[in-house]
Swiss-Prot record:
GO cellular component: plasma membrane
Segments forming a coiled coil: 147-183
Main location: membrane
Name by which UniProt lists this protein: Uncharacterized protein aq_1842
Keyword Ribonucleoprotein assigned: no
Membrane topology: Multi-pass membrane protein
Transmembrane parts of this sequence: 10-27, 32-54, 69-91, 100-117, 121-143
Keywords assigned: Cell membrane, Coiled coil, Membrane, Transmembrane, Transmembrane helix
Localization: Cell membrane
Classification of source organism: Bacteria, Pseudomonadati, Aquificota, Aquificia, Aquificales
Length: 290
């Protein structure tokens, strides 16, 4: 509702500016500048289109730029002294809503005042004072103070909200980790053989395939192959080492750090079932689940 009222206020202000400048053109019809007429026509037509027909927000953002470009251009090309006062309307309408734009228009007004009154310094200074007074009297300091406080409050709420989301995310992650640990410990308690244990891991964590391979050399604690969707975990046994290979489907599950941590911890518990393997079994799959 407030945005609609604001939009209507701006449109009426621009319409009054067009009517005022059109009246000045009619008064000076004998020496009319057609560039100024073209500028005013474009300004009017675009504002009407934006107000009545534009729904995309990008079109509504055009109007302020028209105010700070086309109206000062009209004042410059028309050579009509009284047209400079139309900028006072724009300064007034922007002063408490968008003070930065009002300041830009004020500076443009100063430049045009210098253009028109460069030979009459007191008259030029009086116009400087007039438009500056118009800016300050139109600026709502109470509104600006309230908006400033609300802005700080909103930024603080936004910061606290992001902090809360981060804490909630950490809580959910820890909850998943604890749940996975419970599943692994339950499987460890209920499984008597490595095969039963890894079948339980496959079922609980939806793993496509699990292989256990005796090795002599360790390439690292974990090795990822994102193309094949495999995770290799090297486990130290009492006699030698073993490599537990998980095949995940789809492969992007390798990007889940909580799942990977659970699979790594689950693989390391192989040492509780197996002391080691025969040398003849090196490099061969001694256990395949899936």
């Amino acid at each position: 509702m407030l945005d609609k009222v604001k939009r209507e206020v701006f449109f009426v202000a621009r319409l009054l500016v067009v009517l005022y400048l059109s009246t000045l053109l009619l008064i000076s019809y004998e020496n009319v500048n057609y560039i100024a007429v073209g500028i005013l026509s474009v300004y009017f037509l675009i504002n009407v289109y934006v107000y009545f027909f534009s729904k995309p927000r990008i079109l509504q953002l055009i109007s302020p730029f028209l105010d700070i470009i086309l109206v000062p251009a009209f004042v410059f090309f028309s050579k009509i002294l009284y047209s400079i006062y139309a900028l006072g309307v724009l300064i007034s309408v922007y002063a408490w809503r968008k003070p930065v734009l009002a300041g830009i228009i004020l500076l443009e007004t100063y430049g045009l005042a210098f253009f028109y009154f460069s030979g009459h310094y007191l008259l030029m200074i009086s116009h400087f004072i007039l438009f500056l007074a118009l800016f300050f009297t139109s600026y709502n300091f109470e509104y600006a103070t309230v908006v400033g406080k609300e802005r700080k409050r909103i930024l603080k709420l936004k910061k606290n909200y992001h902090k809360l989301l981060k804490e909630f995310s950490n809580f959910e992650r820890e909850k998943r980790m604890f749940s996975n640990l419970r599943k692994i410990l339950k499987l460890l308690r209920e499984s008597k053989e490595p095969k039963d244990y890894f079948e339980g891991l496959k079922r609980e964590f939806n793993v496509k395939r699990i292989s256990v391979i005796p090795v002599n050399e360790v390439e690292g604690e974990e090795v990822f192959d994102y193309d094949k969707g495999t995770l290799s975990v090297f486990v130290k046994l009492d006699r030698g080492y073993a490599k537990v290979v998980y095949e995940l489907d789809p492969p992007f599950r390798l990007r889940d750090p909580v799942l990977i941590q659970a699979l790594v911890e689950g693989a390391k518990l192989l040492s509780l079932y197996v002391e080691g393997f025969e040398e003849s079994a090196e490099g061969k799959q001694v256990l395949v689940v899936g």
